[in-house]
A protein has these predicted regions:
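Conserved mid-core segment of classical short-chain dehydrogenase/reductases
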Residues: 1-13, 57-60, 113
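Active-site helix of classical SDR
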Residues: 27, 64, 72
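Short, small/polar-rich loop/turn modules that mediate ligand/substrate recognition or access, typified
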Residues: 80, 85, 145-149
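Residue(s) in the substrate-gating loop at a strand-loop-helix junction
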Residues: 48
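C-terminal substrate-recognition "lid" of short-chain dehydrogenase/reductases
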Residues: 126-153, 158
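Alpha-helical segment proximal to the catalytic Tyr-Lys
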Residues: 32, 77-78
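A glycine/serine/threonine-rich, flexible loop-to-helix segment
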Residues: 81, 94-121, 163
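Catalytic Tyr-X3-Lys loop
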Residues: 5-24, 44, 68, 119, ...
Length: 163
């Protein structure tokens, strides 16, 4: 976490390795297998609301996540003719280890919320769980006529919805 102009090259490269390149490495290997099998398949990418609505001092995370959406679309474009689909889930405010307790409290406090209310601060007033995101991935993987799309799983956050 840092303002983008203050972010070290090392920290930015680390974020790109985790949030973009890891997806590229895995997708490339998967396409090799799927091409060899000749049966099509589906690639799933873990996007983030930060691609559409980055936060202050979250550029090192948001920038590779925005590039990840372009990567997913590139796979859809280049491998759709082989029956290989590609899509992403765009989740927000899922309880993960990304934020430690102090960071979570600071984000919640900045919005006038408790830590628990922070996770329910969406149009549905409902906490979005990892299971919700898994269901979205399953839906995408089983949608035979869908490729190049993003499904948002955030309980409703208009500022972070793809435009």
């Amino acid at each position: 976490q840092s303002a983008i102009a203050d972010c070290s090259t090392q920290d930015l490269e680390r974020s790109f390795r985790i949030n973009l390149y890891a997806h590229q490495w895995l997708a490339s290997a998967a396409v090799s297998v799927l091409r060899a099998q000749g049966m099509g398949g589906f690639l799933l990418f873990n996007a983030s609301k930060a691609a559409w609505n980055p936060g202050a001092e979250f550029g090192p995370y948001a920038i590779p996540k925005a590039a990840l959406v372009a990567l997913m679309k590139q796979y859809a474009l280049e491998y759709g003719a082989l029956g290989i689909g590609s899509a992403a889930a765009n989740a927000d405010r899922i309880r993960t280890q990304l934020l430690d307790a102090a960071e979570l409290q600071a984000r919640a406090r900045a919005r006038g919320l408790s830590s628990d209310a922070y996770y329910r601060a969406n149009l549905l007033a409902r906490e979005v769980t990892a299971d919700d995101v898994a269901e979205a991935f399953l839906h995408l993987a089983l949608a035979p006529s869908t490729t190049g799309s993003v499904v948002t799983v955030d309980g409703g956050n208009i500022a972070a919805s793809p435009r």
